[in-house]
Amino acid sequence: MVITGNELWSKVQQALQHNLSKPTFETWIRPAICSGFRDGELTLIAPNSFASNWLRKNYVQTIEAAAAKIYGQSVRVSVQAQEEDSAERVLPPMTSASIPSPLPTAETTTASVAPSSGPRRILPGLNLRYVFNRFVVGPNSRMAHAAALAVAEAPGREFNPLFICGGVGLGKTHLMQAIGHYRLEINPEAKVAYVSTETFTNDLIQAIRKDGMQAFRDRYRATDLILVDDIQFIEGKEYTQEEFFHTFNALHEAGRQIVIASDRPPSQIPKLQERLISRFSMGLIADIQSPDLETRMAILQKKAEQERMMLPRDLIQYIAGRFTSNIRELEGALTRAVAFASITGLPMTVESVAPMLDPNGQGVDVTPQQVIDKVSEVFDVTPQDMRSSSRRRAVSHARQVGMYLMRQGTDLSLPRIGETFGGKDHTTVMYAIEQVEKRLSSDPQLASQVRRVRDLLQIDSRRRR
């Protein structure tokens, strides 16, 4: 049979699309491209080393079987990683195929999924909308999404624990709960627990008060998969950290999967025991960044299709351009716009919706990224320096000015500003603003630099309350 490598790979993809789940196909199979077919060997290129390793370990035999059936004789498959400088050519564009159909409207699961042999039934409390099919993958989240799916497919193997970090409203909880849904779909009898750190702490306190520590330990250590959200709130809680450390060890040694989410990496969580930092870092740390414009537009388009709404492209682009911080704000803006148009009877256009989203022109003047970029330019540091924990004098001063101008030029709260600068505490932001205000009156050079950044950003001199 005479066939080119691209033709063979295309036919293999078509065959596998019917045999694999949609998240699996979209994450691992669709992005790979064929780079050659010679002497019975099909060479594939994956977007990165992470994807190539996963394909080799989990799907090469499946691909070889499908290829052999199509080609009529055995086919060897080799997988390589795309070079970093050309990786963008491999990453697939966002298409309508990535947009899933709506799920049931119920918000959370209500039935127990733990087997009756367990010490107690564990209610996952998962939001039915938080599944892989409803997660829009962009450059900001591709690694975290792939890691989450890998863990869902093979828990307790490669990435244990999986530590997902990123700012507020970027999709950490969505990915965590998607892992839980995936496992329960494969095995409805799996013991899955999704808990916030606050819930874990409260359960621990109640166990201590009621002399129920053994029941507490049995409950958490009997899980097959534990999903722990907002682990940053464990900071400073010594006894909670102690108990979580032992729970972590018990689960990890038993080969149970642990998934943790935080707004910052383990090393940046204040007052976190070194041994927990070590445990949290021993698997894979997957970071989620703020989505770019194209991803934000894809998110809005997906939400509109799920709600069966037809929105003009310029309105989607307008909303995506105005709300850049996180996905919750983005979807919230769309919800407000739809409600406004429905109540007033006005058409869904930029002209009719813009005044509601930005009353009196007093909305967000600049984006956080613009502030960081311009301050970095004027103060001769890098944006990475601004978000780092570096205490070098030049970096520290630039970071303080960035926080000061972000408070003036955006509507972000102090905690949100802190998150933008690598997860700094809101008290750090307050201190930075106070220091800059004090120095402006006595440091002409600083005043000149601040004026220059303000001019570049066109920020007025008012102080937001």
From Swiss-Prot:
One of its GO terms (biological process) is DNA replication initiation. Residues 1-73 are annotated as: Domain I, interacts with DnaA modulators. Residues 125-341 are annotated as: Domain III, AAA+ region. Pfam families: Bac_DnaA, Bac_DnaA_C, DnaA_N. SMART domains: AAA, Bac_DnaA_C. ATP binds at G169, G171, K172, T173. GO terms for molecular function: ATP binding; ATP hydrolysis activity; DNA replication origin binding; lipid binding. Gene3D superfamilies: 1.10.1750.10, 1.10.8.60, 3.30.300.180, P-loop containing nucleotide triphosphate hydrolases. Residues 106-115 have a biased composition (Polar residues). HAMAP family: DnaA_bact. Belongs to the DnaA family. Plays an essential role in the initiation and regulation of chromosomal replication. ATP-DnaA binds to the origin of replication (oriC) to initiate formation of the DNA replication initiation complex once per cell cycle. Binds the DnaA box (a 9 base pair repeat at the origin) and separates the double-stranded (ds)DNA. Forms a right-handed helical filament on oriC DNA; dsDNA binds to the exterior of the filament while single-stranded (ss)DNA is stabiized in the filament's interior. Domain I is involved in oligomerization and binding regulators, domain II is flexibile and of varying length in different bacteria, domain III forms the AAA+ region, while domain IV binds dsDNA. This is Chromosomal replication initiator protein DnaA. It comes from Prochlorococcus marinus (strain MIT 9313). The lineage of its organism: Bacteria, Bacillati, Cyanobacteriota, Cyanophyceae, Synechococcales.
